[in-house]
């Protein structure tokens, strides 16, 4: 069991795995995966939300007791992202938002300039902002300085499954951050999630790695276990890396007691 909770702004969560909902073939498959993951916080694209209720995604999250985290997926400018966040606040009655401002459809990488502009406006408007950002320590610090409640650097581009391509930068972000760091995007399998936590991240957000797996529920369970294992390993402290081997058992030295020589 994870020994302490994930705290972002004024909310605490027992699970350090945040799930996305994109890519699931249907709600039944998504439900199985969400239950298996143990997540308590799940992103939803506001453009997919049926604000009138019904039997859709929001009803599912409500039945499972999972907090929805609206995101601004698909937005290409600060103005568009701010408007989408404001619509989400009205539709879902929450001031939390996962902020995404994408530079282009080919890479789905964040537009750093528009991202900071949107973050500044949303923080001023009373939002709890969780920005999806590049693995850039300087940009992460700038977002924190604007008042973001967490920073969410990518491991690799969305949906690639390449894992963490620049672990050193993630470590630098963790080392200088005064807010939670959530590894977001690029996770391909459980070992990637474990590595993120070992590098010092406070949580992992993933979607495609689960929703497009051959067995989404099984992969969700694996991701949950990996996040816990990586977190506990980080707290336990890994041994230093060494160039040469070092025996784990002490060398035994056999000596004769005084007067034991033959003939005496």
UniProtKB/Swiss-Prot annotation:
GO BP terms: thiamine diphosphate biosynthetic process
Pathways involved: Cofactor biosynthesis; thiamine diphosphate biosynthesis
The keyword Transferase is assigned to this record: yes
Localization per record: Cytoplasm
Domain of life of the organism encoding this protein: Bacteria
UniProt-annotated catalytic positions: 98
Keywords, ordered alphabetically: Cytoplasm, Schiff base, Thiamine biosynthesis, Transferase
Protein name stated in the entry: Thiazole synthase
């Amino acid at each position: 069991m994870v020994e302490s909770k994930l705290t972002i702004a004024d909310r605490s969560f027992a699970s350090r795995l945040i799930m996305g909902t994109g890519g699931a073939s249907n709600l039944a498959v998504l439900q199985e995966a969400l239950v298996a993951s143990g997540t308590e916080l799940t992103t939803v694209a506001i453009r997919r939300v049926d604000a009138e209720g019904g039997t859709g995604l929001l009803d599912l999250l409500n039945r499972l007791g999972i907090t929805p985290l609206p995101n601004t997926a698909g937005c290409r400018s600060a103005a568009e992202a701010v408007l989408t966040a404001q619509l989400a606040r009205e539709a879902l009655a929450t001031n939390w938002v996962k902020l995404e401002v994408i530079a282009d459809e080919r890479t789905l990488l964040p537009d750093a300039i528009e991202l900071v502009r949107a973050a500044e406006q949303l923080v001023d408007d009373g939002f709890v902002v969780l920005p999806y950002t590049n693995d850039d320590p300087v940009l992460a610090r700038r977002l924190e300085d604007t008042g973001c409640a967490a920073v969410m650097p990518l491991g690799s581009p969305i949906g690639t499954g390449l894992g963490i391509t620049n672990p050193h930068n993630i470590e630098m972000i963790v080392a200088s951050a005064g807010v939670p760091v959530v590894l977001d995007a690029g996770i391909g399998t459980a070992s990637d999630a474990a590595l993120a936590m070992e590098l010092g991240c406070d949580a992992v957000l993933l979607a495609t790695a689960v929703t497009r797996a051959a067995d989404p529920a099984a992969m969700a369970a694996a991701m949950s276990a990996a996040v816990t294992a990586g977190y506990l390993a980080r707290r336990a402290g890994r041994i230093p890396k060494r160039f040469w081997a070092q025996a784990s058992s002490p060398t035994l030295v056999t000596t004769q007691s005084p007067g034991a020589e033959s003939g005496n």
